[in-house]
C-alpha cells in the first residue's frame, strides 16, 4: 500500500489523520499498547491523533483514503471514542486511570488490529474524544472496546467491554439536516467474576463511498433513526459479551456496595446474595422456609468451599522454602525494617543443607514410595491389591524445641539473635510462636470443604486388614498385622474423610478457666431474664426487650426465652437457638449495619462505615449488638458469625498492622507492601484517599493539607499507618465505640485482654470445623447403645457421608448451635455445665430421631437398615423447629 505525500493538500490540525501502516512488515506498534498493531488485508486503521505523528505514518485526505479502498466489499468506518460514564473504581490508591483498547477482529480468524487511546488520569468519567478509521468487511468484522484502569504496581484492572457488530451502522451524509450523535453502550463483564459498571459513549458511522452518496444517504435515512446495535449470531464466543440479563423477579433490587461489587436484595425474605436471580429461580414460601432452616450452617460451609483446594499429592521439595519477614509490629518505628536471618543466603543455605542431610539419611517421604502387596477380603470376595504407600514422616524431620508448638525449633544466628523455624510450613520468623494460635489456620487446604463420601467409596482397607460378617449379621474387621479384631471400620480413622483434628490448647484452656472464675456472679438481680419473642420479628422484639433494660446487670440473670406459639421449657437449648437466630439477623447485610469484607472469602463481616445512611438509630443498634455479644460470652453461648481480624484487635485496643490487611484485602495489602519495600516518589501519591459514595467520588485527607503532601521514601511509613487507620478505625469509630459500650457493660474490659485476637474470635464464635474423630471420641451412649452397636456404626457412617454443611446442621439439630468450643467436643456444654454429646436408644423404627438441645442428646430409634437411618435422620434435620418433646 503506497501513497504520495507531496500530493496531499495542506491540512489544518483537526484534519490531520494518522494512518497506521501494516506493522507486520515494519515491526512497529502503537505507543503505549501491549497488543501488537497488525493490519492484514482487507483491513486498515487510522487514528486521528495529530500530536503523536511518527515518521512511518502517512497523511491522507478523506478522498484519497476512500479512493484507495473503493470496492464493493469493504467499507471505511469512523469510530469516535468520546467518553466513559460512571466507571467502576478499581484503583485502591486513588481514582482510576482509564483507557480504551479498540480491537478489530474477525470471529473466524481472530484479531486483525488493535489500537489504544490515551490514559486519562484519576477520573471515573474520562473524556477521550479520539477518532479512529478502520477499513472493514461489514458483514464479517466486529469491533471490541475494552476499558482498563492503568496500574503501575500490578496488571491493569478490567473495567468493562462493549462488543459491536458492524453491519447495522449508518453511513455519513453531510447533506442530512440532523447529524449523527453518540450512543451510550452499557459496559459488560468478561466473566461472572468481573465487577463492572457504567457506560462507554461512542459514535460509529461509515464514510460514504465515491459516486454513491445518494444511495448511502437513503440507507442512512432508513437506519439512523432506529439505529440499534445487535449481536451477530456467528460471532466468536470468546469475544462476545454475555446476553442482556433478564429482568429481576418481583421484590428484588440490584445494588452495589462501597467496593463496587454488585449484589442483589430480596425485600420479601430480607436477604442478600451475589448471584443474579431470575424469574425461574423465584422460590415459593415453602422453599424459602427450607432455605431459612438450612441457613444456620451456610456461613461456615461457604467459607470453606470458596477456598482453593490443593491436591493431596502436591509434595514440596527442600528448595521450596518461603522466607517470612519480620512482623509489621515495627513498621511505624523510626528504625528500618529488618528481615529474619533466613533472608541471609548463608543461613538459608545452611538450613536447606541440614534438611537435605536428614532427608538423605532417613529417606525423602516425597520421593520414596515403596510398593507393598497385601491380600484383603470383603463380603464381595478377595482380591490382590498393590498399594503405593508413602514413607511415613520421621519425627527427626520435625524437631521441636521445648515450649514451642509441634514442628517448631528455636535457633540462633551468627550474631546470637534467636529466631524460630517452622518445619511444618518451612518458614522462619522472629516472633516466638504460641500454643494458642488459631487451630484452623493449621489445617491444610486439601482437607477443607470435602465433598460427600459415597457409602461404597470409603476407599480400600488399609494393608493387612480384612472385612468379615459375623453370624448375627454384624460386620467386623480383622487386623492380620497384629492379629486382632474390632467392630470399628479402620477407614473411619482416615483424616481426609473425618476432617482435621483440632490441637488441644492447654494455654487457652487455662485462660478460659481463669476468665470464667473471674466473671462476677450478681446477687442483687432476678433469678431469670425472660424474653417472649416472635420468630418473624426476632430482631425487633429482641432489640426492644434488651435495650429496654436500664441496668445491664439484669442481662446476666439466667436466660428464659419463649417463642410465640411454641411449647417447651428452656433449660438452655432455646437460649442457644436464640443466639443463633439473632446472629443471623444482626449480621445480615440487608439491614446495612454490617457488610461483607473485600477478601476472596466474601462472607467475612466488617462494620459498614455508611451504616448511618441505612438506619438513623444505627448507634443504638450497635450498642444492642454489643450487649448481645456480651450476653453470649457471659452465658457461655456462641455467636454465628466471623469478623475480620482488625475487629477483634479493636476490641482489645491493639494496634492494627499491615499484616492484618492481608487477610482482608490482598490487593490493598500488595500495593501497600510494594510502597513499603520500594521508593514511591515516582507514583506521585498524596496523603489522600478517594472514597465513592452514591456514584460520587470524594477525597479524604489523611492529615491536614494531605492533598499537597507527596508520599516519599521518608514519609511512606506514616502514609501506610494513616491508610490502615482510615481503612479500619476512623471510618467506623462511632459504631465500634457503641458496640464496645454494650459489650463491656457485661464483660470487664481488663478481663477480656487476657486473650489475643485469635482466642477472642474462638471465645465468641467457637470452632468453625467439625472433626468427626473428636466428635465420636467424646460421645456417650445410653439405653442399650454402645460404640460397637450396629445402629451406632450406621450413624457414624452417615456422618462421614455428610458434607460439611450437613455435619454442621446435624450438630445444630442436637446441640442448638453450629459451633463447638475451642478445645473440641470434650468441653461441650449443656444447661447444667459440661455435657457430652449423647446418643440414646429410643422409640421404634417408625419414629424420627429427636433431640434434646439442653442436654446435647440425640434420641435415635433402632432402625433396621442403614438406608432407613439415613432417610429418617435427613428428614429430622430438614424439618425440625421447636416441636413438642424437643427442648
UniProtKB/Swiss-Prot annotation:
One Pfam family matching this protein: HECT
Phosphothreonine: modified positions: 284
Chain ranges of the C2 domain: 54-180
Residue stretches making up the WW domain: 246-279, 402-435, 459-492
Subcellular location: Cytoplasm; Nucleus; Cell membrane
HECT domain mapped to chain residues: 551-887
Cross-link Glycyl lysine isopeptide (Lys-Gly) (interchain with G-Cter in ubiquitin) residue location(s): 847
InterPro entries given in the database record: C2_dom (IPR000008), C2_domain_sf (IPR035892), E3_ub_ligase_SMURF1 (IPR024928), E3_ubiq-protein_ligase (IPR050409), HECT_dom (IPR000569), Hect_E3_ubiquitin_ligase (IPR035983), WW_dom (IPR001202), WW_dom_sf (IPR036020)
Region annotation (Disordered) ranges: 297-319, 362-384, 396-440
GO molecular function: beta-2 adrenergic receptor binding; enzyme binding; ionotropic glutamate receptor binding; phosphoserine residue binding; phosphothreonine residue binding; proline-rich region binding; protein domain specific binding; RNA polymerase binding
Modified sites of kind Phosphoserine: 212, 306, 377, 382
Biased composition (Basic and acidic residues): 408-417
Catalytic center residues: 854 (glycyl thioester intermediate)
Spans annotated as Mediates interaction with TNIK: 214-548
Entry's Gene Ontology cellular component terms: cell cortex; chromatin; cytoplasm; cytosol; glutamatergic synapse; Golgi apparatus; membrane; microvillus
PROSITE patterns, per database record: C2, HECT, WW_DOMAIN_1, WW_DOMAIN_2
A biological-process GO annotation: ubiquitin-dependent protein catabolic process
Predominant location: cytoplasm
Means of activity regulation: Activated by NDFIP1- and NDFIP2-binding.
Biased composition (Low complexity): 373-383
E.C. designation(s): 2.3.2.26
Catalysed reactions listed for this entry: S-ubiquitinyl-[E2 ubiquitin-conjugating enzyme]-L-cysteine + [acceptor protein]-L-lysine = [E2 ubiquitin-conjugating enzyme]-L-cysteine + N(6)-ubiquitinyl-[acceptor protein]-L-lysine
Domain notes: WW domains are involved in recognizing PPxY motifs in substrate proteins. The WW domains mediate interaction with LITAF, RNF11, WBP1, WBP2, PMEPAI, NDFIP1 and PRRG2.
More about this protein: A cysteine residue is required for ubiquitin-thioester formation.
Function: E3 ubiquitin-protein ligase which accepts ubiquitin from an E2 ubiquitin-conjugating enzyme in the form of a thioester and then directly transfers the ubiquitin to targeted substrates. Specifically ubiquitinates 'Lys-63' in target proteins. Monoubiquitinates IGF1R at multiple sites, thus leading to receptor internalization and degradation in lysosomes. Ubiquitinates FGFR1, leading to receptor internalization and degradation in lysosomes. Promotes ubiquitination of RAPGEF2. Involved in the pathway leading to the degradation of VEGFR-2/KDFR, independently of its ubiquitin-ligase activity.
The protein's name: E3 ubiquitin-protein ligase NEDD4
Organism field: Rattus norvegicus
Top-level taxonomy: Eukaryota, Metazoa, Chordata, Craniata, Vertebrata
